[in-house]
């Protein structure tokens, strides 16, 4: 099988790029020849540009084109739109990382023009995005119906995607986020209990709630809280860690100081991927206190999961999560617990529960380790091969559907 993968890839720093790198390796191990035609290309920001880019390439040499859709990225979405109109096209597939929508962001010319105006106030841009949303949703549904197969990482995400995109249930496969195969490391000594926030550090991840919850535990039960340490770790890309109000990191550090937590909070920033397992496994528990954007809620329900949670599972560690996204499903296997997002008192109670009954940590860790075996990337790759075979059976090429169209000039330039 020959597959063209449309996705960001490292060294680009985002969760989908990290996912795609492991995904590509798992497919290679399953015997799939993976091409990455978007690698090194400039972003594609219009359907006309996508059609021109697609027309230059001979897609007859590919069995499946699979895209990683998420993060509001346009290149992959627009390329799939262009490919969908090709005669005798290959099978088209996508992993939807942010269901219930495919892209969430407008793709029309007005939005492109407005979004490029640095002087335009952010509320004005958001108003344009909201007014453009009916057209965005129409484009998403059109592409979703044209795809031969879609993948979500959770059942929750699949259910929302099917409903919002108006798809047949059998068009969507659920394939859990793959887990790296890592050496088992037992939990560290239970005094102190070490909590870890791990992920990109920017507003919207609810890190403030975690700091406030630990502060609440300390204020109410100082002796109990003395057995607690918190590490805040992750990426700090300047475009997300700094904003109009200054450094977000400085704001978090000031919050830690106001809560009297400075001696109990450690910071590990811009962690190298090779060091992630060691970082996670020297902690007892990951805490992901995400909050959903109220503005995004005007457009729908985002029910994706998290690469950070996948790391916790791979490393054999439990998690306390908010009920944002599809987190409640991901820790419903006995590998953690959840609380209502934004409820600092509920999060503080969860932390107190762990301090009072630390034996729960080993139970969560054991279940996480079992999940990691079930979701190992080599097995995940095989599941995707099955998904692609089903998509190929649905594709126009398999059904013998063909029509005349412009000849590709790709063979004159370079070969897939």
What are the residue ranges of the model-derived segments?
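Acidic anion/phosphate-binding donor-loop and adjacent secondary structure
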Residues: 162, 178-192
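Short hydrophobic beta-strand element within catalytic cores of glycosyltransferases
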Residues: 311-314, 318-321
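Nucleotide-activated donor-binding/catalytic signature segment of Leloir-type glycosyltransferases, i.e.
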Residues: 244-277, 285
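Conserved acidic donor-binding segment of nucleotide-sugar-dependent glycosyltransferases
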Residues: 333-344, 352-359, 373
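Membrane-proximal helix-turn-helix segments that form the acceptor-binding/catalytic region
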Residues: 114-150
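A short, well-ordered alpha-helix in the C-terminal region of glycosyltransferases
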Residues: 353, 360-374, 386
């Amino acid at each position: 099988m020959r597959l063209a993968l449309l996705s960001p890839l490292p060294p680009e720093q985002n969760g989908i790029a990290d996912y795609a790198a492991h995904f590509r390796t798992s497919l290679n191990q399953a015997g799939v020849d993976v091409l990455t035609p978007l690698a090194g290309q400039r972003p594609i920001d219009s359907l006309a540009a996508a059609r021109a880019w697609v027309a230059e390439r001979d897609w007859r040499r590919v069995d499946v084109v699979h895209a990683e859709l998420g993060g509001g990225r346009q290149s992959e979405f627009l390329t799939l739109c262009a490919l969908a109109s090709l005669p005798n096209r290959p099978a088209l597939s996508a992993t939807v990382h942010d269901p219930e929508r495919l892209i969430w962001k407008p793709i029309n010319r007005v939005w492109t023009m407005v979004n490029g105006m640095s002087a335009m106030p952010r509320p004005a841009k958001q108003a344009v995005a909201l007014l453009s949303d009916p057209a965005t949703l129409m484009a998403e549904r059109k592409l979703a119906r044209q795809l031969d197969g879609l993948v979500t990482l959770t059942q929750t995400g699949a259910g929302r995607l099917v409903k919002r995109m108006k798809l047949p249930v059998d068009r969507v496969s659920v394939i859990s986020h793959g887990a790296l195969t890592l050496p088992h490391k037992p939990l560290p000594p239970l005094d102190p209990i070490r909590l870890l926030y791990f992920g990109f550090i920017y507003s919207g991840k609810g890190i403030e709630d975690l700091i406030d919850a630990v502060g609440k535990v300390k204020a109410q039960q100082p002796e109990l809280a003395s057995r607690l340490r918190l590490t805040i770790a992750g990426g700090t890309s300047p475009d997300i860690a700094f904003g109009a109000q200054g450094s977000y990191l400085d704001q978090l550090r000031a919050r830690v100081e106001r809560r009297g937590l400075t001696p109990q909070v450690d910071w590990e920033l811009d962690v190298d991927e090779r060091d992630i397992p060691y970082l996670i496994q020297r902690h007892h528990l990951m805490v992901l206190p995400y909050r959903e954007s109220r503005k995004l809620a005007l457009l729908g329900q985002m029910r994706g999961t998290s690469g950070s949670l996948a790391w916790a599972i791979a490393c054999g560690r439990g998690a306390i999560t908010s009920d944002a996204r599809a987190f409640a499903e991901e820790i419903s296997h006995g590998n953690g617990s959840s609380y209502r997002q934004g409820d600092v008192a509920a999060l503080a109670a969860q932390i107190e529960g762990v301090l009072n009954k630390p034996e729960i940590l080993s139970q969560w860790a054991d279940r996480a380790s079992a999940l990691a075996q079930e979701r190992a990337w080599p097995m995940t790759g095989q599941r995707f091969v099955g998904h692609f075979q089903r998509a190929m059976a649905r594709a126009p090429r398999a059904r013998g559907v063909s029509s005349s169209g412009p000849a590709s000039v790709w063979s004159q330039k370079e070969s897939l």
